[in-house]
Amino acid sequence: MGYSVIVIDDDEDTVRLFSEFLEENKIHVIGQGYNGKMAVELYQKNRPDCVLIDIMMPNGSGFYAINKIKEINPHAKIIAVTGDGRFTTEQKLEKLQIPVIYKPFKMNEVIQKIQS
């Protein structure tokens, strides 16, 4: 069986395109959300193998969601997908041990991170 993921980004086009690409590559998208609060709700409901999440979003940032998801499951696999390359963001992600993919990204890089 393939991997299951939820895709979280405040840009609906990004979520749609990302999801289509993942499905084409046999990665099952079991949830889509547009803010940190939705990410937590989708994780609780679906328990995916992996969460792909943007960092800068309204109604609960990616960091909010990461912390809440880690409270639910400390071993949850989360990958940050962000255009925010500030050093402070990098430090926070490193401290949380969250791998990051910077926008613009290559989809092959995303597939590799999900499967690793």
Where are these regions (language model features)?
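C-terminal output helix
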Residues: 105-114
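Residue immediately C-terminal to the conserved phosphorylatable aspartate in receiver
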Residues: 43, 55-57
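Acidic catalytic/metal-coordinating carboxylates
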Residues: 35-38, 59-64
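Two-component/phosphorelay signaling modules centered on CheY-like receiver
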Residues: 12-31
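Short amphipathic alpha-helix used as the core "switch/output" element in two-component signaling
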Residues: 41, 63-74
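Active-site residues of response regulator receiver
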Residues: 9, 54
